[in-house]
Amino acid sequence: MYLQKTYRAGKTIEIQKLAIRRHPRSARQKRHSPTPEAMAAYNKKLAERELTRLLDENFHGGDLSIVLTYRKGGRPSQEQAKDYRSKFLRSCRDYFHARGEKLRYVETTAYGERGAIHHHLVISGIDYRDLQAMWPHGRVIATPLDDTGNYWRLAHYFVNQLRASPATGEEIKGRRWNPSKGLRRPPPKTEVREARTWREEPKPIKGYYIDPDSIESGICPLTGEPYQFYRMVMLIPGRQGKERMRRNQ
């Protein structure tokens, strides 16, 4: 018997399966106790999955992944950077509001390997020249999202950004990322399956393929029970194998 959670987010479907113990542990069986390192890795994985669903549900081809940098001679303190970022987002909101649209974004602030603070965002599609005009502090590096709707690699990139300065050790406080208000958060469909186990190699439903890099099987550090995870992605008509597996960098 196992618990299955299904999340539908945009063009993707996430499947999470977790074995359920039929009988309580006996007095002789040890209670599972994960190490702090295992729990930290597990929590980071959950954060990555949550952000993936948020991106897959709310963004699409033509939206942008951008990096806001600072000129070498004008690198701000953490508080100044926070203020500059807020002013940039206000300008973006005004830009979209004037066009009868609503700004969608997810952002995070991070440090580079050499200690340069910068901002990463996934944002509604906007002309590059307008973006640069709203950011006078340095370069705007913009990359359009592809149309696969499968943005977990972008989520992985966000979650693994440096949160502490290599030079000073100063940490960026708060959440790993900050979303705009009103983004849709896909709810799970939860089912208890009576089968003793699941298929070792999962099969996609009609009209989808399984991203092979998303498949995970192992022991859940929280419960000590087996689990399986994978993500199905909607097939794009006319696309073939490798082309539909393009990756967002």
Feature annotation, model-predicted:
Residues 1-115, 125-249:
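Right-hand nucleic-acid polymerase module
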